[in-house]
Each structure stands twice: as C-alpha cells, then as structure tokens.
C-alpha cells in the first residue's frame, strides 16, 4: 500500500469532512398487502424490523473498522399507497405510525416510502395517501413522504400538482410549533428514481429486488480542497481535478456498500454519487462554485460552474463503481449549505437563480423557506415549474419547500442537525391561482416518444 494514499484518505476524512452520508436498505412490502389494515400493518412492522435488524449495528462496525464516518442509517420501503390501497380505510395515518414505530425499534435515522406515484393519475389509494400526508408527518418523527407528479413519458399531472400545494400548506400549519418542519420531510418529484438512498425522497421501487443496499456518499469539502491546489488554471484542469476526486470518493462508497451488502447478506444496489453538503463550514457545494471563480454563488457564471461540477462528478464516479444510480449529482439545498445560506442573506442568490441552477444539477428547489402566508396556488405553480424542467430535460427534479408559519422575508428558520437554518426567501407575489386551478394533464414532450 502507498503510504501517501493512506495519509491522503485520513486527511480527507478528518480535515475535509469526507463521509458516507447514508447506508439505506430498500425493503419490498408487496408481500404485506392485506385487505385487513391491522394485519397489513403487523406484516409491515415485522418485515421491516426483521429485514433491517442488523443495519445500524453493521453500519457502526464498518465505521469503527474502516474509520469512515457513516452519518445516517436509513430504510426505504415500497410506496405505501400501493400497499394500503388494498384496504377499505379512509386514512393511512396508522400506516405512517407503524413505519415510525419500526424506525424507532431499529434505531435508524429516517424511513422513506410514505409515497404515491401519480404522474399520470391517481388511484383510490393514492388519493387517500396524499390526503393523509399532513397529519402523518405531524405525528411521526422519522417518516418521510414523497409524491411523483410527472415524468418524461407521461407528462405532468396538474391535478396532483394543485393538490400538493394545499398539502404542503396544511403540513406546515400542522407543524407550526416547529416552524413547518413537517415540510422538510416531504418531497414532490418529477421523474423520481426507484433506488434513491437520500431522504426525504427515498422509496423502494416495485422493479427493485426483495431487499437492496444503496449508499450515498458526500464530499464537497474534499472537492473544494482539491480545487484550491489548481487556482488560476484552466477549466480543463478544474474538470479533471473534480473527476479524479469524485473517483476517490466513490471508491470509498463502493467499499462500504459491498461490505454492508456482504455482512447483511443483502444484494448491493447502487452508489449515489451526489455531493451532499452539510451546514458545517467547509462542507459546502456553494464554496466549490466560489473556488471555481465566483465571488459569491448566485452571480453570473454560477450555472456554468455548477453544470461542469455536476458532469465531472458523474464522469469520475462511473469509473469508480460498477453500479451507479439514485440522483447522482450536486445537491443545492439552501438550509443545509453554509455558502448558500450566506449568499441568500447577502442578496446574491434568489429563487429565480436557484430554479436556473436546478436545470443542470440534482435535484431541485430543496430546503427553501418561503413566507408563511404564501398561497397554496403559488406553491403549486413552483412545483409545476420544477416538474416542467425535469420532464422536458429528462431528469429528476423536485421541490422541498417550507412555507414557514408566521415568518416573513428575511427571517431565519432553525431546523437543527443536518437540515440547518433557512433564510426566508422572497417569492414573486403575482397570482398563479387561475393557472393552478385548471387541472388536467400537461402532455408528455414530443421527444419522449423513443420507441
């Protein structure tokens, strides 16, 4: 072994905040379907707790043996609208409570899959699940919800988009004692992926295996430190440096994924290449963009820098791992990135620029606080804009937005932990009410017809 490479790895972990953001076990609940809701919930609880009983323990073992921090251990399950749809119940809140209880028993950080896939229309189960989201997120701690409202092959379900604006508002209202924290556990997608290890949008797709291990890496600090060594050099060198660094980060992710897979006797699924920031200084995607040459993220050139970063991360990552998937790109969550927070506060970064940035990276308008009195129709229109970007560009986009109750532009909303602090951002106050209320479907784009 090369001593320099060992020292480099130690430095990346200790000084540059390299870590494994999550080991996520995906679990199929299709065999838990039952027309009796009580029986279905018992099956769900038993299946999750039995399947993932050693997940936290194995994560800690790998962490101590290899010296690699593993920040979160998580579980994702089959979208609950599919499982609960067989019952005659008119609310799925009890299913959310069962998931929360299972998460507590396991000692995991989050459990994703209180989800519905409605890109082309809603079943009875989808409608009940969506209407259950506000209460479910208000009374549970670890359950995350997601709704897929569009895809490139089907277009955008504008009825669901309209409804999700109302659901987000109601979720914020029911969790107003925590500044609308319930909305931080709710994602609205276009082109959602089935193997996403990251919360709050993770669910276990119906095309996945019985159980699977997916890993999400994180290393913005490592990329920034590498770029500090090539200051003033051309974009060719910058791209190559990012690529080589992403290769190293992903190699570590694959090592952990394979080791977890072997010890848990669960197949290895994918490594998600996403650069996921934290609120800690030096662990920021915004700081990478500024290192590339921007005085402050949000100024002209931001989108080009982000596009290059995203592409170089993918190119480096795919060479390092046999199975890459999930969202795989650079995350730009405002509240979780110290550089983004600073840019919003000083006026360099606004909502319109963030929308532009989502065209070239993963995933979308993420962890953004807006005034609490924002109309539901405006939130629906924001979802529609992001869904359109995803559907037309054949990529995953999403909205995780918090209309913070009682807060106005310039206020700070504290979520704590990895979710950080969100400055309340200004929105366009012109009405989108008539637009949001039209309903129906926006047809799939012409270039979606590939057959």
UniProtKB/Swiss-Prot annotation:
- Which PANTHER family does the annotation name? UPF0210 PROTEIN MJ1665 (PTHR37560:SF1), UPF0210 PROTEIN SPR0218 (PTHR37560)
NCBIfam families in UniProt: PRK05313.1
Query: What is known about its subunit structure?
Result: Homodimer.
* Top-level lineage group: Bacteria
One of its Pfam families is DUF711
Among HAMAP family, the record links this protein to: UPF0210
Official protein name in the record: UPF0210 protein CLH_1879
State the Gene3D superfamilies in the record: 3.20.70.20
Q: Belongs to which family?
A: Belongs to the UPF0210 family.
Q: Which organism is it from?
A: Clostridium botulinum (strain Alaska E43 / Type E3)
InterPro entries per the UniProt record, alphabetical: UPF0210 (IPR007841)
The cysteines joined by S-S bonds are none
């Amino acid at each position: 072994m090369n001593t320099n490479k060992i020292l480099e790895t130690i430095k990346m972990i200790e000084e540059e905040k390299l870590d494994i953001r999550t080991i996520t076990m995906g679990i199929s609940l299709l065999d838990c379907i039952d027309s009796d809701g009580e029986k279905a919930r018992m099956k769900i609880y038993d299946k999750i707790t039995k399947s993932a009983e050693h997940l936290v323990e194995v994560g800690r073992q790998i962490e101590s043996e290899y010296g690699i921090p593993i920040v979160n251990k998580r579980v994702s399950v089959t979208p609950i609208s599919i499982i609960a749809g067989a019952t005659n119940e008119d609310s799925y809140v009890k299913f959310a409570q069962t998931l929360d209880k299972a998460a507590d028993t396991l000692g995991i950080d989050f459990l994703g899959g209180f989800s519905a896939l409605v890109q082309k229309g809603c079943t009875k189960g989808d409608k009940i699940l969506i209407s259950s989201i506000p209460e479910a997120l208000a009374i549970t701690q670890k359950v995350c919800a997601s709704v897929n409202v569009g895809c490139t092959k089907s277009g955008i379900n504008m009825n669901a988009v309209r409804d999700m604006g109302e659901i987000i508002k109601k979720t914020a209202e029911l969790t107003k004692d925590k500044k609308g924290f319930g909305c931080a556990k709710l994602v609205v997608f276009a082109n959602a992926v089935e193997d996403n290890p990251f919360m709050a949008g993770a669910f276990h797709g119906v095309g996945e295996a019985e159980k699977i291990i997916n890993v999400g890496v994180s290393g913005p600090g490592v990329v920034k430190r590498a770029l500090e060594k090539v200051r003033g050099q051309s974009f060719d060198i910058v791209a190559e440096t990012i690529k080589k660094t992403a290769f190293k980060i992903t190699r570590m992710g694959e090592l952990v994924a394979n080791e977890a897979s072997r010890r848990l006797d669960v197949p290895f699924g994918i490594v998600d290449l996403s650069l996921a920031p934290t609120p800690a200084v030096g662990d920021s995607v915004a700081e990478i963009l500024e290192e590339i040459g921007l005085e402050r993220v949000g100024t002209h050139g931001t989108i080009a820098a982000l596009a290059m970063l995203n592409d170089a991360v993918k190119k480096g990552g795919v060479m390092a791992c046999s199975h890459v998937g999930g969202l795989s790109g650079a995350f730009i969550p405002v509240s979780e990135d110290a550089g983004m927070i600073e840019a919003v506060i000083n006026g360099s970064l606004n909502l319109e620029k963030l929308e532009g940035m989502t065209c070239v990276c993963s995933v979308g308008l993420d962890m953004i606080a807006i005034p609490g009195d924002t109309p539901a129709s405006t939130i629906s229109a924001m979802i529609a804009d992001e869904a359109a970007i995803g559907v037309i560009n054949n990529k995953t986009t999403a909205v995780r937005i918090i209309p913070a109750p009682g807060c106005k532009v310039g206020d700070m909303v504290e979520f704590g932990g990895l979710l950080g602090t969100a400055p309340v951002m200004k929105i366009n106050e012109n009405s989108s009410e008539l637009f949001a209320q039209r309903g129906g479907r926006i047809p799939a784009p012409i270039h979606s017809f590939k057959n």
